[in-house]
A protein has these predicted regions:
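Bacterial N-terminal signal peptides that target proteins for export
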Residues: 2-15
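Bacterial N-terminal signal peptides
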Residues: 13-26
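Sec/Tat signal peptide C-region and signal peptidase I cleavage site
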Residues: 27-31
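Non-catalytic structural scaffold of enzyme domains
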Residues: 32-260
Length: 260
């Protein structure tokens, strides 16, 4: 098991981010008035194409039966700094925590972190979420549990190298949580993603073909890859798990008032 420890400087930055959150993290997508009977949730993006936001928020609305207020937070610098450094640094952690703090102040009942590259940071904040009464869940957490329940040999597919390690660790944590041994392999399939969807899904299937032969199940590390899931599943004859549906389900389950 990997232990994630942050030095004192990190927590000083975290405290500063909580104090300055309203200045750092303006909310978009929030209703001016909120019906207390309608759940309010927050979504934190660090890479946010219009298609990704539409897919994530559509999945959330479907999970909640359309009755949900969604607060949206975006900060591309968190992803950029983390991907470049290969780890979560003080500044990116403080910015992320600032978004969480503003979501809590704004009345969110639970927070969904969409970026797989910062999955370790979202995981490390579970204790904060418990104390604050505003749980935070990573979009891949429940998907990784489903992968572990479905097979021992799990293949992680990603288009960004920075998404691989955190997703692998999420799977290993899920294995430990469920008491199951797992074997994780990875394939990074870059090139052309987002330009020609049809061409890319074929490229993705071919890049995964060899590794998929020895895998029980395939996990897409990034929710932005979800449109390719059906094609890859059909081409390779392997079950493919993709978000945002698992993240939406976990977000609803995390709400204190959900009773789940």
């Amino acid at each position: 098991m990997t232990s994630w420890k942050f030095h004192a400087g990190f927590w000083r930055a975290a405290a500063l981010s909580f104090a300055c959150a309203p200045l750092l993290c303006p909310v978009s997508g929030a209703a001016a008035e909120h019906d207390a009977a309608i759940p309010k949730v927050a979504v934190i993006y660090t890479v946010a194409t219009p298609e990704l936001k539409e897919g994530v928020e559509r999945a959330i609305r479907e999970e909640f039966g359309g009755k949900v207020d969604i607060l949206r937070y975006e900060d591309a610098a968190v992803f950029g700094e983390t991907a470049k450094a290969g780890k979560v640094g003080r500044e990116s952690a403080a910015r992320f925590l600032g978004m969480y703090a503003d979501a809590a102040r704004s009345g969110a009942g639970a927070v969904l972190s969409v970026c797989s590259t910062v999955a370790d940071l979202a995981y490390s904040m579970r204790g904060v979420g418990e104390l604050a009464g505003v749980p935070i869940v990573g979009i891949n957490d429940e998907m990784c549990r489903e992968a572990v329940r479905s097979g021992k040999r799990i293949l992680v597919a990603a288009t960004f190298p920075s998404a691989v390690g955190p997703t692998r660790r999420s799977i290993l944590r899920a294995g430990a949580e469920l008491g199951r041994e797992v074997e994780v392999s990875e394939v990074v399939a870059g090139g052309g993603f987002g330009s020609d969807a049809g061409a890319f899904e074929k490229l993705l299937a071919e890049k995964l073909r060899g590794a998929a032969k020895s895998a029980d199940i395939i996990v897409f590390a990034q929710a932005s890859m979800e449109p390719c899931a059906g094609f890859v599943e059909g081409a390779l004859g392997k079950r493919v798990l993709a978000n945002p549906k698992f993240g939406a389900k976990a977000l609803k389950s995390a709400l204190p008032e959900s009773g789940e």
